[in-house]
Amino acid sequence: WGDEGKGRVIDLLAENADIVARYQGGNNAGHTVVTEKGKFILNLLPSGILHPEVTCVLGTGMVIDLEHLAGEMEAIEARGVKVEPENLKLSDKATISMPWHKVQDGLEEDRLAKKGGAFGSTRRGIAYAYSDKYRKKTLRLGDLLHLDEERTQNRLHMILDAKNMELAGCYHQEPMSYDALLNWCRQQAAYFAPFICDVGAFLQQAHDSGKRIVLEAQLG
């Protein structure tokens, strides 16, 4: 399925919504929306972001490439679209697509290609982010708010040790340093902290008060 208008339907519904909540997927698919400001291609942001009165949510079930999201936000802001904590809320329980997820995706695709069995991956690390989510070996957005806590730092060490063993053992990659990882996390926290919240409580309150909520999946 593709190019038959799923995103267009969501955009039409978003015009009359109070909230558009994306609840799963990552940035390996997207949709195109055309407004009076031109054509926008969105991979992570819900199409409701183009409507100034709509609040958008990236929910718990998503895996979020934060660098891609920042680029998407800045690109539409440069064209006059408001992106602020008041109209974009990120779940504190959403999974972070870490830098190594794309690396691992690309390395595995290359390995399989040599054997004639490549999947045709987008190389954006979505499958690996979800895999680590269910193995409890990655971070959630809420962890960015607690980087100075010993518990979070211990978790970072545990996750990094496991990932370095995978990348070194399977793909002969040089290990990543803890300091570089912590610095990357701090950069993401500085940018995204104002947007991170308990979106479950936000949506429950909105539902109870009669707000119109549209749920958007990865493909529409």
Report residues per predicted region.
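Non-transmembrane, aqueous-exposed alpha-helical and coiled segments at domain scale
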Residues: 1-220
